[in-house]
Amino acid sequence: MTTFKAILLGIVQGLTEFLPVSSSGHLAVTQHLLGVPEDRILFLTILLHVGTLFSVFFVYADDIFMICKEFILMIVDLLTGKGIRVNNQYRKLGLLIIVATIPTGIIGLFFKDLFTSFYNSTLIIGISLLVTGTLLWTAEKVNTGKRDIKDMNWFDAVIVGLFQGLAITPGISRSGSTIVGSLFRGFNKELATKFSFLISIPAILGATVFEVKDVLEVGLGDFTLTMLIAGVLASFLSGVFAIRTLINFIKKEKLYYFSYYTWTVGSIVILFSLL
């Protein structure tokens, strides 16, 4: 393992975590090309996820601060006998993030082993990439939603959470699936994008907790402090770039551009799986 490889893995993690192209598949391919066994870099992988989390905190700092503030105030209201008062958009958004996380967590807990087994099938990965591309294309072409946060309800959050849960399938993009799920529910593009990135926080945190258990079993690995810092910084910076790039693409109604990429990669993967 070298610092250069750590930086390259960080860049791939940051870009593909938030661009709708499936991060798991790209990271696995990159590890293979670099000749780095997955079990030897689990600790680095966890830190790269932390770097991408910082990306979301950086881009949506104001929203996250207000959500946390209002959530604390809502708990204070509850403890002082005022009940749960959802009297502003940040309180509502915070509760809906929790609701969306529930189906995601259930799928992750009970079906993780099943979906993980799909990593052994390049055919399934290729087909999943084609599905991702088709969803992105369809959502961009047929959606005319204008629903805002005031129009959201718990059922919307559950549906988007289910989309996020199914994204543990290798080849299915988490950001792509949640944005598509939001657009299918009629959200406006700004809300669909924001909600997708905000619900990624508990999802990434949860996945990271599961990975910590694996790290304790295989060890931290042979890394220098320079390697770790370089990798995390690379994942953070590339993550910020990816989030802002995706926001720009969605504003310009060019989300379907990513369809061409996932269709191409998916077709290549399927072709190789059949050879």
Swiss-Prot record:
Which GO-annotated molecular functions does the record name?
Answer: undecaprenyl-diphosphatase activity
Pfam hit, one: BacA
Its Enzyme Commission number? Answer: 3.6.1.27
Q: What is its main location?
A: membrane
Write down the chemical reaction(s) this protein catalyses: di-trans,octa-cis-undecaprenyl diphosphate + H2O = di-trans,octa-cis-undecaprenyl phosphate + phosphate + H(+)
**Which terms under GO biological process does the entry name?**
cell wall organization; peptidoglycan biosynthetic process; regulation of cell shape; response to antibiotic
Q: Which keywords does this chain's UniProt record carry?
A: Antibiotic resistance, Cell membrane, Cell shape, Cell wall biogenesis/degradation, Hydrolase, Membrane, Peptidoglycan synthesis, Transmembrane, Transmembrane helix
> Which InterPro entries does the record cross-reference, listed alphabetically?
UppP
Transmembrane segments annotated in the record for this chain:
1-21, 41-61, 95-115, 118-138, 192-212, 223-243, 255-275
Family to which this protein belongs: Belongs to the UppP family.
Entry's NCBIfam families? undec_PP_bacA (TIGR00753)
Further comment:
Bacitracin is thought to be involved in the inhibition of peptidoglycan synthesis by sequestering undecaprenyl diphosphate, thereby reducing the pool of lipid carrier available.
Q: Which HAMAP family match?
A: Undec_diphosphatase
Designated name of the protein: Undecaprenyl-diphosphatase
Native species of this protein?
Answer: Alkaliphilus metalliredigens (strain QYMF)
Name of encoding gene: uppP
